[in-house]
Amino acid sequence: MYTTQFFIYGLLQLALFVWLLRIHRETRQPVALLLLVPQFFLVWDNLRVAIGPLLGHGELLYWLTWPSFWAHWFAGCWLIIGAGAILRMAGFDFARHRAVMGAFCTVTVALMIHDLPNFWTEDIYPVCEYDLIRYAGSVSEATRCFPDQALAGSNHFPLAPVVTCFVVMGAGLALWSRRGFPWMFLGGLLMLISATPPFARYKLDNLGEVLIAGGAYWAIWHFTRSAARPVRA
């Protein structure tokens, strides 16, 4: 069941990648090109989980897993820059100032620096959960592959994803209230909800990643095709 679920997530993320690539080719928006990088690895992340039971634990799956973690630490917060760029596209005067866009970029870089030590301090471990065979950053009682497998890793507070989610929601709320476009806010909100324990235990947080990315890309598509009237804020 969950293997199929991740395969579907991978296909949805692939559809978003193709859509974003098309948006970039049609509009030449730099932000669309920038976001293609994390979007590619969202496809990668879901599909490497989906094929885990086929490959089994071993060197191949181990090395297919690492790029997902590297991309998460390095580019997972680039949607913050996307949020600032979308506000510009939507005609918000304040977002046209260099200092404002610089603030979005500064927050992004700060979060990247925050996660930088993960590249040499974190490790990944074989885990078994439901029908999934994969590698993860920690092993808990619920994800042991055998009874005497040692518990390992630690669950750090996901600062970069949480900040990214709230920035996207904040920008999305501005779009909803001033431009009548609710989808970026709703995508961020559903991402936040899906990452809470009642939903994350059923792997719905990966669906939340589809929704937050989809809401942002929809905003890029929408505001590059509409004559954005200036909005003062």
Predicted regions and their residues:
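Hydrophobic transmembrane alpha-helical segments in integral membrane proteins
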Residues: M1-L16
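Membrane-interfacial loop-to-transmembrane alpha-helix junctions, especially the N-terminal start
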Residues: T27-F41, R96-F104, W176-G187, A228-R232
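Non-cytosolic membrane-interface motifs at loop->transmembrane helix junctions
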Residues: G58-W70, D131, K203-L211
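C-terminal transmembrane-bundle signature of multipass membrane proteins
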Residues: T164-A233
